[in-house]
Each structure stands twice: as C-alpha cells, then as structure tokens.
Amino acid sequence: MKNTFRFGCFLLTAMMSANLLSAQTGSINIVSTAVPFLRISPDARAGGMGDMSIATTPDANAAFWNLAKLPFAEKRTAVAVNYTPWLKDLGLSDVYLASLAAYHKVNDESALSTSLRFFSLGNIQLTDFSGNILNNIRPSEFSIDLGYSRIISDKISLGVALRYINSRLVIGDVGTGVVYRAGTSVAGDVSMFYNGRDESGAGLTWGITLANLGAKIGYTNDARNKDFIPANLGLGVAYTTVMDGNNRLMFGMDINKMLVPSLPAATGVFSTDSANLANYRSTGVVSSWFKSFSDGTNQLSAFQVSVGAEYAYNEQFFVRAGYFYEDKSRGNRQYASVGAGFSMDAFQVNLSYLVPSGSGITRNPLSNTIRVGLLFNISGQK
C-alpha cells in the first residue's frame, strides 16, 4: 500500500488522540482509545466463532483471551502462530496483524504463558498542506506479555499477566514543530475460569476477564496529552456436549464492555467543549474504569456480544460459525463468521472467514477478512 495523507489528516486519524477526535454527538457514543489493535481478534479459531473465546476449551491462544484456562489444557506445552491481513476489502495490501502465543504447564496445577502481537499499518507517504512530500513512514504497534495461571480448586483457576505496549506511529519533528515519539504503556490482565466439564469433555465452562488495565499512552512529552488504552471487562460462557466417541459440539457466548468512558457530548460552545475535554483527559486511569459505567450514555448499548459454535469430529476435523454484534451508536460492527480446522498428531491448522455484509457505503470494511492460524503441540498429554 502506498497511501498519501496530508500530514494534518494523518495526525487526526493515526495518533488516536482523544483531543483530536470528534466528541460524541447525538446518539453516537463511540469510545476512542490508543492502540485499538489490542481489541482485534488475533486467532483464527476465535475468529471463526464471532470472536468468542473467553470460556472455550483451552489451547495456546488462550493467552490472548483468558489465560486462566491454561492449567486445564490437555497438552503440556503448545505454541500458536496467527496471521490476519487487515481491511483487505478496502484494497489495503500491507496492513496486517501477526501474533504468537505459547504456554508451558509447570505441573498439573499451574502454567506459564506468553503472547506477542505485531500490527503493521503499512507504508504511508506524508505530505504537507501544499502537497510537498515530507517522507515515508511505516507505523507499527506491538505488545508482549508474560502470564501465570493456577488452579485454586477442582474446577476454578485464576490467571494474571503483565503486558508491555509500544505504539510507534510518528517519530521526530515532521514539519509541525512538535516532536513525536513512540508511545509506551504497561498493563495487566486478571482472569478467572470455571471448568465444569467431566471426563468425557462434556459440561459447562465460564470465565471472567479484566484486560489491558494500565497506564495511558502519550506520543509527545506533554503529560496532559495522553490517551486511554482499551481496558475491557469480558464475561463468557460455553457448553460442550459429547454425542458419542467421535462427535463433540460446543456453543457459547461472550459479552464485552470497554472500561473507557465516552467522550463528553459536544455543546457547540468552544469554551465549554474545551473545558469538558480537558476534564475528560484529566480523569485518572482507575477512575475511568468506574466512570465508564456512568458516563451519561446508554450503558446497554456499550456491550458487545459474540455467539459461536464449534463442531468437532474425532478431534481431527472442526467446523465453526459465529456472529458478532455491536450497537450502531458504538461503532456498528455486526458480522457473521465461519471457520474450519484440521488436526493431525501435534499439528493443527485453523482458518476463518468474515462473511461480506452490506453494500456501497454501508458495506462492512471488515468483509472478507481471512485469518490463518497454526497450532503446535510440542509435548504430550499433561
């Protein structure tokens, strides 16, 4: 991709700074944060089930969704690699999300895990307002984390993770008089998992996750000009039924809520809007988590819902389907997805496809998104 942006417009879109974004108007209450790539579904298995994965059966990708699942994993050590071309339906060819996750069970009750996400925004050519070329940049973002999870009772486990986040969008002075730098943050995850499956694998599972609880990100030395990261509360439930020795069906639901308050409503009065925005930006991180439940907007519209199912034959062939729903006032992402998987010995491949929807200006820009994932079980049964 070689997109040309006027520099001012690039800052408006790429920097993800709340003070540069439009405040909510009318019934539109989209929450803006830095590093939104942290909320992109990274793996193909979850992608085939409408981005549902908080309470599904554990594999290496659990490090992205709910690492508390990992002590209940059947394999002692596993690694997952995933690749997602992003916004292909818009003609972009070099924007992608790549991810890696791995875990190792220290014993039958605890596990160590790690995950890495790398998001490339492609090649972007910057120009000034006169059309003069400034330079070419390749913005990128990544996160890396380490986690520990442990079974605390026969059916319940807890997990914690520490994450480093780096967002390198613009570096140095590119003709505006402002010196930009990479934005960094440190965040944590806390999660719980209930495993009610019996020896055959049938039963109820559910989980709770608190993800990306961490410091704001800034792209300049101005301490007042920092943005929230996408803190999130997730609840998930799934049920697995084993029809016979060869056939298994799992279905479930995830509900997610961003722990970031909406921008203050625009009044049209510059002094008032400036004061409201300054007050919003001065909100502390911990305070913002609680304020997200009382920011003056319709809280029912703030919940994102994923429903999905997975059919497995002989734990070798997998078929998946799901649906993701987000209210129109919060971004209007609504799509169906399908997926498939094949497993042989220590190797598994997963694919997912986001079904096209809408047409013209209403066409979903995520249409035709394909995710590819590989899973390697390095050591045997737990």
Named regions from a protein language model:
Residues 1-27, 237, 309:
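Bacterial Sec-dependent N-terminal signal peptides
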Residues 24-382:
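Subset of outer-membrane beta-barrel
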